A protein has these predicted regions:
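Active-site phosphate/pyrophosphate-binding segments
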Residues: 4-123
Length: 130
């Protein structure tokens, strides 16, 4: 699969895929993810997004709120949330990654997002079937 074979990405290695296969998960979906992240346009998009995020942090927007509109991506986004929190939450700095599952959270926390402290930036997360 050729992703990183140790550390926080070891779950995407062949050894990490064995338990996934035994649990009935489709390893081909992980291979599709691997192909996606190897795509140069994907990384151009990430680089552009990082520049935007740095600008938001300079503007004191410290909460990264992902509005998830794809229920099946919840576990993936929790993994992303953990990576961001562990990687950037050091030395009294970082951003707070928050995953809100829509439309459920639309009724429970949207009021806070809209009228509370304005230190959030938002990412809308959708999955388009190909």
């Amino acid at each position: 699969m050729c992703i990183r074979d140790r550390g926080r990405y070891s779950v995407l290695s062949e050894v990490g895929m064995l338990p996934a296969e035994l649990m009935g998960l489709n390893a081909n979906k992980f291979k599709q993810f691997n192909n996606l992240i190897k795509n140069k346009y994907f990384f151009n998009s990430i680089t552009s997004n990082v520049e935007n995020i740095l600008e938001l942090i300079r503007a004191k927007k410290f909460n990264s709120v992902i509005l998830n509109y794809d229920e099946s991506s919840d576990n993936f986004l929790k993994w992303y949330q953990q990576l961001v929190a562990e990687s950037l939450g050091k030395k009294k700095s970082g951003i707070l990654p928050i995953v809100s599952n829509m439309p459920k959270d639309n009724h429970s926390v949207m009021q806070l997002y809209l009228d509370g402290i304005q230190n959030n930036f938002f990412t809308f997360f959708f999955v388009k079937e190909i």
